[in-house]
């Protein structure tokens, strides 16, 4: 069994490090990402996904934080995919407003992952829909997707989430 297969097995046990590694595989794309996608799609596990979108400074992170707090008050597990602009230097995510979610950083019932848009228009990363499915496979029943600050024509989130706010 190779390391990726071990990570996929570890996902079922709730291993957060394995989840982070598998999400990195999905973000990189290629054959390994397709293998993950095939396994996850065959499982039929899809979480409830809620897209949070709006113009820069509209309060997306503040709203996401409040929604996460509400679900955690009900003892529900919740994941957040926060799509950020890509750094022109590293290509990675510029960690924008994550400071508003710091109160959840040590909560084992919350998983927060920043993803770089990598120049993709529409407020998402190309890997976002598959990352949502991976989170569902890993046992996260609700996923909030916070987009990069977007304008009126960037509506990719409406196709990637069950509900859009």
What does each model-identified segment do?
Residues 3-50, 55-58, 64-165:
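Nucleotide-state-sensitive switch-loop elements of NTP-binding domains
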